[in-house]
Structure formats: C-alpha cells, structure tokens
Amino acid sequence: MAPLSLRDCKAWQDAGLTLSTTSNEVCKLFDATLIQYATWKNDSTLGGIEGCLSRINNTDPNFVMGHVAANGLELIGTGRSPLVDKELDDALKTMSDLSKSQALTEREKLHVAAVETFADGNLPKAADLWERILQSHPTDLLALKFAHDCYFYLGEQRQMRDSVARVLPYWKPETPLSSYVKGMYSFGLLETNFYDQALKVAKEALAVERTDSWSVHTIAHVHEMKADLDSGLSFMQETENNWKGSDMLACHVYWHWALYLIEKGDYEAALTLYDNHIAPQCFASGSMLDVVDNSSMLYRLQMEGVNVGDRWKNLVQITKKHTKDHMLIFNDLHFLMSSLGSKDEDTTRQLVESMQELSKSPGEKQQHSLIKHLGAPLCQALIEYNGGNYDKAVDLIYPIRYQILKIGGSDAQRDLFNQVLIQAAINSDSTHHQNLARVLLMERDIGRPNSPLTQRLIKKWEALHGLLG
C-alpha cells in the first residue's frame, strides 16, 4: 500500500469529521490507528495500533475519540469482558467521565454512547447508534467498521451488507482507503449469497490494493461455499505473500486454506498448516478470531476421525482464561469445544454454569438473552455429542438449526454446527434420526455440489444404513 498522508486537525475538519483536540500529532495518530484497523495490519512504521493509542493518550489524555477507539477496539475484539476485567471497566468509566467534562461534537457524543452501549451488551442498539453517525457522516470509517463487526456478531447479514452499501457512493476512488470499504461490501455480498457479485467486487478492491486481506478473505469464502477447492487452493498459494503480513487476519486466512484441505480429506496437510501457521499465530496474538479458528479446526478434524494429539491441551490453556467472559455465545461454544477436547471437566462445568447464571437476568445484554433458548441447548448438544449421546445431540440442535444464525459468525464458521447435526444423526440409534440425516445430506449435496466432505458423509450413511437414494 502506498504511504497515506496522515490527517492533521484541519484535514479532519475539512473532511467533515472534526476532532476535539488541538494537537495535530494526536489527529495523525488517530488516523494511523484507523488505517491499521481497516487494513488488518499492525504497521511497525506507524507504531502498531497499541503504540499509536498509547502515544495519543500520552500526548492528549483528554482526547475522547482516543478513548473511544481504544475501548471500542477492545470490545469489538471480544477478548476482554467488562464483566470480569476491572481495567477495561475503569477505562470505560474514564471515557464516559471525560465525555461529560468537555464540549464534544454530536458525532463524538454518539461514538461514546455507542461504545458504552456495546459494553453494556446491547449490541443492536450500539449498531443503531453507529448507523446514526453514518447517516450524517458516511465517511466515518470507525463507525462503519464498528457497525460492520457488530452486525457480524449479531448474525445480521443483510444489515452488514447494506450498512456499507448506503455509504459506498460517498467513498470516491481518490478517498483514502476507499478500496478497503469496497472489500467490506464484498463480504456483505458473500454472506447474503451473492457469490458472483462478491467475487467481482473483491477482485476490484484487490486490483487497487493487492495486500487487502479482507478482500482475499471474501474470495476464500466464495470458493469454500461453492466447494471449488482447486480454485481456492490455487488462489491461496498464489496470493500468500500478499496477505500473510496482515497479522490480524493471516491466521484466519490460513484457516480457510485448511478448510479446503479438510474438505478434500488431506488431513496431514491441514495439520501441517495448523502447526506451522494457525496455532503459532494464535498463541502469539491470543486474539479471539485466532482462538475460535483453532478450536473450530481441531473440532472439524476430530469429527473426521483424525487424532489431533495434545493440541487440545495446548489450546485450552488460552481458552480457559476466558471461561467467564461471556462476550459472545459464538466464543463460548468454541471455548467449550476446547475444554471438551482436552477433557477439562472443571472448565466445562464452570463455563456452562456461569452461562446459566447469566441467563436468569439478562437485562439488556443481547447475548445473554439468547443463552436459554440457543446458547444452552447448543452447549449441551456439544457435551452430548462428545459423550456419544447422539440421539440427545440431534434433539437439541435440530429444533433450533435455523436460529443458529443469531450467534453470529460467517456461514462457513457456523457450518460446523451443520456438520455436528449430520454426524450425530448418522450415528444415532434412532431410525427417525437416521432418516433425518439422509434428507439433510440431500439438502447439503444440492446446496454445495461436488463437495468431497458431503460425499464422505453420504458413504458413511450408506455403510451404516444402506443406499441413500
């Protein structure tokens, strides 16, 4: 990416995005933070996101938007929870107090309110507040990115797409980072099943900036959803040098690469990717995206009958630290996979019991309100599946299969639960469940033709129960 000119106070004002500080250095550091967030890359020449935010705070500790960015990024990362993290909770209070002690623009006030609302667990309302900002300030990249990520956590696929579509015309080709906004739009198109259009838009973004790892990620998804494995593998290999430097997303792109290999049944190659890239990057970063990718990959391999050795025991050392965070049900389910895989019964019990406790009085916490009817049954289904109680696993997952979208994540990520349901139904002693598995396999085969994984599952069904058709 060509070096971008960092905006000073006047440049922000000229863009209609006035910042309440008199420090040009702070304005430039804030811009540097946004650039790194948008490009999924901690840039050492800019000091990394953490370095930029630290310098902002040292230079102008009263700069509210610095606190908004710092707290918002922590919350959106979902790796720290104000429920159990006093330092984060104190930082949020500092932000709120500062916002009340000085004159701010209406846009800045809305940013503070949105971060406070997200911290309180009311994700839909937080998204609405970021949308209010975008209605008046369509080039506010922080509001756009926060809204995009929030919709992703809510499973609101159309909103994720349309939120970007509403502002995209304001991002002219000469506007810095406009191609990255186009890449965001490509992902929304993908998640709403406009695969060909998503591919076209992602390629347009990559034609401007080939290191745009989010657009690479969109294309990886398209090949995954179409089971076009050879094209996916070729694309990964040909572009690896372009995206592997995006430290905040590279692990996830390698995870997509590994999904192709698992789909093909090339488990050794998948484990090699895990050991060489996916696990090391997770242990280095500790980021939630990397953590859930590690859990998901090991679980998928285990469902395929692969012995993953001590890898679960290594991973649970990270996941058990987040047992009582309860930021997202999606995260909790992946922590549970890790504790089950490592046979850590105490951590499993703590996770489930603390979830159940929070479900009793969720208040405005949107994720906690989903525990009783969605999170708890899914957790119990994984526990039953792990114990070989396939009948119970099916009875828990099948009634809510069309609600699983609400836990957030992508279609590719949530496909794990489709696979659990099918595997459990195949292995069930119930004739009813076996018949369910048969029709689910037919559904899957039509929706994703030429999938080797589906063909393996069909052969497994036929080996146990006779011809499928």
Swiss-Prot record:
It comes from Xenopus laevis (African clawed frog). Signal peptide: none annotated. SUPFAM superfamilies: TPR-like (SSF48452). Keywords: Repeat, TPR repeat. The lineage of its organism: Eukaryota, Metazoa, Chordata, Craniata, Vertebrata. This is Tetratricopeptide repeat protein 38. The gene is ttc38. PANTHER family: TETRATRICOPEPTIDE REPEAT PROTEIN 38 (PTHR16263:SF4). TPR repeats lie at residues 107-140, 179-212, 251-284. Belongs to the TTC38 family.
